[in-house]
């Protein structure tokens, strides 16, 4: 049950673990359900000997990173539990946030604009890319993005919730406008991240609608046939992307569920 991240089933087996260990299991169950307040409540009074939320020091605002990284850990647990349909269904909202974070890094560094300045948040609970703000603040990039859409027989950008497809074209448009010379390391990093985002776009386009609306069972083999890598390799690529995009990212976070599982096994 620990290996499959089935913490809910362990909680139902009352008295199977000591009270402190059951509190840790309750923390993991709430955390894997993205119930942050509940997860932190169960940590009170526990002395684990390691940080449950490892993070690099002096990293500034953690709210966006914490949300994105915890969502990724849930996706990684789906992959480990071989719940590939759930993994693909969660990929779309996760990747859009990751694309926004990377666009923010590039826009701040090379264009003097933050991604927040281009987003409207009055679209219900969803964010959207503002066409007006994009044309006002980055007219050349906006024109380039529209041309890329027209080249693909798509209409120019409208006021809509963002998509992986639109953000990939936006990213290409931003990279194309970078004037200053890039180091070899910067070039490699950009190439790797663009490749990852395009890979995820293919996966999302191929399977998301069928996973959401049809009685399908996605397998690792089907995913590998689509993108040329299995989900374990894709998870590793996403981990590298998180490290590249977020200075706060401590790679120890990626193994925190294993660390907690090991703690439970040792102290059982």
Feature locations, PLM:
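Charged alpha-helical initiation segments
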Residues: 2, 18-84
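Solenoid-repeat scaffolds in large eukaryotic assemblies
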Residues: 6-13, 36-42, 87-88
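Amphipathic, non-membrane alpha-helical rod segments
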Residues: 7-16, 230-234
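Amphipathic alpha-helices that form helix-helix packing interfaces
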Residues: 27, 46, 68-71, 75, ...
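Short, flexible helical or helix-coil boundary motifs
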Residues: 50-53, 141, 145-152, 173-185, ...
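Amphipathic alpha-helical interface elements
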Residues: 62-174
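Charge-enriched, short contiguous segments at helix-coil
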Residues: 177-254
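Conserved non-transmembrane functional hotspots
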Residues: 255-268
